[in-house]
């Protein structure tokens, strides 16, 4: 974890002691269709996941809350002791959350607990995927532990201990049956490493050295793509062949990246932001930059979202920024009056969770 992210975490810890959670309450502006917006009060949100009609937010009081993405109404609420700030993962049937030293799978329809699996320490990010017709949860810890869990039972299928810490979200591709994870090298090393492995067995397909200022990886269109830099303004966005690890293309970027930034990928586009706030969208088929936009705000921890016509990020300064996908032009800057901890899109709505606000809430607004 970089010094900036450690400082940000420390500030949040200091502040939380003086904040009282708000009770759930939903407000709507009365409009319908595409223009309908809503705001639902929640107590001190940690993280947010959005998938289809479901918005899942982890909050204080050791709870996970599911809301309807169209109306904002609460669908269910589940108790999960020591739930973390890592983003909930959703698929058609499951909500996966990390909680202290374990992962917990909840039924997406009801919030009922399906299983929990101990991972020993500092549960981090996870992803729900499949091996053939079998659902699995690929999970990680901050101390470099990686495991594949049976999606139905939580039983470990395989596990591996990497020789370094994991701060970036893992990624997986069910079609290719592979996963990828980025980890930091030992204390005396100045590089990170990227490992691509077989989802069914954990067998290593290939590994590559990556510059220390790297984003999380994303698997898209037969490649593993991430941003990497040396911390001294030598940086790039690079794609490596999923099967072999051979470099397919790279494009320059003006600054290095943070492991808390997860690139967005859809269609023929991949988009990522460096830590000084320059967003780069790459045409993956041509291996060329389509546009770069400097929003001039630090970006240390965000999932980059790609909607049909928009790119969405959240900044370290507490803004949610929307850009036109085709041109890179900034079309909207949302100041939620607090700190956004997660963003998502659904049914042409931009959805975000905000804390340090009056009130702390999950809110939906129309996409530009």
What is the predicted function of each stretch?
Residues 7:
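A motif-centric signal for short, conserved binding hotspots located
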Residues 2, 10, 18-368:
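Secretory-pathway ectodomains
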């Amino acid at each position: 974890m970089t010094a900036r992210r450690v400082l940000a975490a420390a500030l949040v810890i200091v502040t939380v002691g003086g904040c009282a959670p708000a009770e759930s309450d939903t407000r709507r502006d009365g409009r319908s269709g595409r223009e309908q917006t809503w705001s639902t009060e929640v107590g001190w949100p940690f993280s947010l996941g959005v998938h289809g009609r479901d918005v899942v937010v982890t909050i204080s009081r050791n709870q996970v809350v599911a809301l309807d993405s169209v109306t904002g109404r609460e669908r269910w609420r589940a108790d999960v002791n020591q739930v973390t700030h890592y983003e909930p993962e959703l698929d058609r049937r499951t909500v996966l959350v990390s909680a202290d030293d374990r992962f917990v799978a909840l039924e997406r329809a009801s919030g009922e607990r399906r299983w929990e699996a101990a991972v020993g320490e500092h549960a981090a990010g996870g992803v729900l995927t499949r091996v053939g017709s079998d659902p699995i949860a690929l999970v990680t810890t901050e101390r470099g532990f990686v495991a594949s869990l049976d999606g139905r039972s939580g039983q470990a299928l395989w596990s591996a201990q990497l020789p370094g810490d994991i701060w970036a979200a893992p990624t997986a591709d069910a079609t290719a049956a592979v996963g990828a994870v980025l980890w930091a090298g030992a204390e005396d090393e100045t590089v990170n490493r990227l490992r691509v492995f077989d989802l069914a067995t954990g067998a290593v397909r290939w590994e590559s050295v990556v510059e220390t200022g790297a984003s999380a990886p994303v698997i898209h269109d037969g490649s593993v793509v991430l941003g990497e830099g040396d911390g001294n303004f030598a940086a790039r966005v690079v794609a490596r062949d999923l099967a072999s690890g051979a470099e397919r293309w790279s494009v320059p970027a003006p600054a290095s990246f943070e492991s808390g930034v997860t690139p967005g990928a859809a269609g023929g586009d991949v988009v990522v932001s460096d830590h000084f706030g320059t967003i780069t969208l790459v045409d993956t088929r041509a291996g060329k930059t389509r546009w770069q936009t400097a929003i001039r705000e630090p970006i240390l921890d965000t999932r980059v979202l790609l909607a049909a016509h928009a790119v969405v990020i959240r900044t370290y300064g507490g803004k949610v920024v929307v850009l036109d996908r085709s041109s890179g032009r900034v079309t909207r800057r949302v100041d939620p009056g607090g700190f956004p901890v997660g963003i998502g899109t659904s049914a042409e709505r931009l959805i975000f969770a905000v804390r340090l606000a009056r009130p702390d809430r999950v809110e939906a607004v129309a996409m530009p």
